[in-house]
Amino acid sequence: MNLKITINQQASISEKLIIANLEQLLIFRDNTFNKIDCDQQITLKDAVQISQILNDQGVLNYEGEINEQITTYLEACGLYSQGQGQFIKRTLQTKKINIPQQDFNNCYGKYDYIEQKFQNQINFFKQVDLKGNQETIDENELLNDGVEVKQVESCASKPRACANCTCGRKEMEEKQDKEQLLEQLKNNSVKGCGSCYLGDAFRCANCPFRGLPAFKDGEQVKVLQDDVFLKEKEETDQIKLENGKVKLMI
């Protein structure tokens, strides 16, 4: 079957000749025509469509102006020039390739098969035979009437009570320290620091006046058991400052 591509479609259509234009090429199937006559200016898209509907060794007679660009389009679509505007479509050559069958027994990466035998499972709950000469343990020997109590480390060898003392030694030592300080004050003892009157910031850790505000020489204080109170306008124990040292006058 032949195809004539032209703008003028007034000619009669026969069974062996079809007259159409470039816009109608999409309606044709592949490998439809043996010969195509074309007198229109074709583009690369038109050359691709002409190559698709032309049979192998089919002939294209191009009646338009032939230039280098048209020739390049047609050659890119698989047609070669025969001169005088005639182009022939190349036959696609196919060659059968025989691929040898691969021997998978010696292929790379295959490992030798090693048959693995499963070991006999050990029965951990197997009944023990008591008829033998096996020694048994008397359960009565495991019992002990005595209760094991962890012995608390003694602090008798330490000079002072522990920081987290729970035996009462810490409270007893604090009470003894307070009694000793009060006894020293009542016996007209002299404090070596000489800064009790300045306030808590300048007093010792065991100073009996801790907690009291700063006082001046001649102010009256009253000592009642473990506490020291600041009193005014009462005749009681008197504190005096002599040579930078504090004395309790009883």
UniProtKB/Swiss-Prot annotation:
Organism: Paramecium tetraurelia
Keyword line: 2Fe-2S, 4Fe-4S, Cytoplasm, Iron, Iron-sulfur, Metal-binding, Mitochondrion
Coarse class of the protein's main subcellular location: cytoplasm
Motif (Cx2C motif 2): 204-207
A GO CC term assigned to this protein in UniProt: cytoplasm
Function recorded in the entry: Component of the cytosolic iron-sulfur (Fe-S) protein assembly (CIA) machinery. Required for the maturation of extramitochondrial Fe-S proteins. Part of an electron transfer chain functioning in an early step of cytosolic Fe-S biogenesis, facilitating the de novo assembly of a [4Fe-4S] cluster on the cytosolic Fe-S scaffold complex. Electrons are transferred from NADPH via a FAD- and FMN-containing diflavin oxidoreductase.
Family: Belongs to the anamorsin family.
Region feature N-terminal SAM-like domain, mapped onto this chain: 1-102
Region spans: Linker: 102-149
Region annotation Fe-S binding site B: where it falls in the sequence: 193-207
Pfam families in the cross-refs: CIAPIN1
Name recorded for this polypeptide: Anamorsin homolog 2
Short sequence motif named Cx2C motif 1, residue ranges: 193-196
Residues involved in [2Fe-2S] cluster binding: C155, C162, C165, C167
Segments of this protein annotated with the region Fe-S binding site A: 155-167
Compartments where found: Cytoplasm; Mitochondrion intermembrane space
